[in-house]
C-alpha cells in the first residue's frame, strides 16, 4: 500500500502555521489555536468513510470500521499540542501518519477484519499546566476529575476554566475513561528527540521501554531585604537557596546512573529586581528514568537537601509533588513485530529505550503497546530547529502501516 508523502508534508506544514504567537509555533492545549488544529483534521476526515468523535477531555477519535466491527480496535496515534516555541514534528508526525494510513485505506477500498482507531490525544505536553499526557491519563483511568481540579496554568487559570473557554465541560471529564477490552493493541510513531539514531546511522528506533517523570514544584520563602543595607550574614536569600537545590539535583542525577536525568526547567525569583534580596523563589523540577530506584533516589536526595538548605539559610521550603508516573517496559512481542517489520522493509534499526514520556506509556496499561522512533537531526527537539528528514518520515510511516495492517488483518 502506498503513502502520499506530499499530503503528509502538507498537513504537517499546515499545522505548523496554526500558532498563538506570530513567527513561532506555540499551540498549547485548550486554546483557540489548538481547537483550530483539531477542526482542520476533522474537516478533512468528513470527506471519507470515517467516524469522528471527541471525548469529554478533548481526545479525538477517528475510526474506520472493521469487517467484524465488534472486535477490539487496533489503535494508533499521538498528539498535536506543542510546547512554547516548538518544532513542527513532535506529536503531529504520529498523528498525521496515522491519518494518512486511514485515508489510504479509504481511497484504496481496503477492508480490515479489526476496526482501526486513530487517537489524537489532548494536552500531551506539560507546557500549559505542568502536567503531561493529560488526555491519555484520563482516558486510561490513571487520573480523574478530582486529581485535575487543582491544575493551574501560569496565568492562574484552572483546567476547568480553560476547558470551558473551548466549549468543554470539566464536570464530564470522568466519562472519557475507556475500557481495556476496547483495544487489541496500540502503536505510536514519534521522532526520537535525541541523537542516538542519527549517530548510529539507523533509520528506525524500536522502543523497548519508556522513561517516566517525577514532576514537582519547590516553593522557597525567604526574606526580601534591601540589597545594600542588609549584610551578607543577615540574609535569607530564597534565590540562592533555589540555586543550591538546582545544583544538588544535577549532582544527584549524575550519581544515580542508569541514564537518569533531572532538570530544573524554570526558576522564578520575586520580587525580581536588582536592589532587593529575593524573598521568594520557585523551581520547576523534572526527574526521569526507566530505572525506578535510580530515579526515585534523586527525588529522595532533593528532600534531604531541602532540609539542609532550609536550616542553613533560614528558609521555609515546600516541596509539592505534581505527578509521579511509572516507567513502562513494552511487550516483547510488540518489540519483535516492529523490529521484524523494519528488517523486512529493508530499514536499519536500533533497539532502544525512550528517555521522553509519551501517551503510549499510558496506553500500555490498557493493551499491548509498541512504539516506533525515527531520527531527530542533531537530537534537537522542543525547539524550532527540530528536524527529521522526509525520507525517514516515509520509512516510519511504512513501518507503522505494516504493523497496523498485520494486527488488523486485511480481508
From Swiss-Prot:
<dbReference type="InterPro" id="IPR001261">
    <property type="entry name" value="ArgE/DapE_CS"/>
</dbReference>
<dbReference type="InterPro" id="IPR036264">
    <property type="entry name" value="Bact_exopeptidase_dim_dom"/>
</dbReference>
<dbReference type="GO" id="GO:0016813">
    <property type="term" value="F:hydrolase activity, acting on carbon-nitrogen (but not peptide) bonds, in linear amidines"/>
</dbReference>
<protein>
    <recommendedName>
        <fullName>Uncharacterized hydrolase HI_0588</fullName>
        <ecNumber>3.-.-.-</ecNumber>
    </recommendedName>
</protein>
<dbReference type="Pfam" id="PF01546">
    <property type="entry name" value="Peptidase_M20"/>
</dbReference>
<dbReference type="InterPro" id="IPR010158">
    <property type="entry name" value="Amidase_Cbmase"/>
</dbReference>
<comment type="similarity">
    <text>Belongs to the peptidase M20 family.</text>
</comment>
<dbReference type="Pfam" id="PF07687">
    <property type="entry name" value="M20_dimer"/>
</dbReference>
<dbReference type="InterPro" id="IPR011650">
    <property type="entry name" value="Peptidase_M20_dimer"/>
</dbReference>
<keyword id="KW-0378">Hydrolase</keyword>
<dbReference type="InterPro" id="IPR002933">
    <property type="entry name" value="Peptidase_M20"/>
</dbReference>
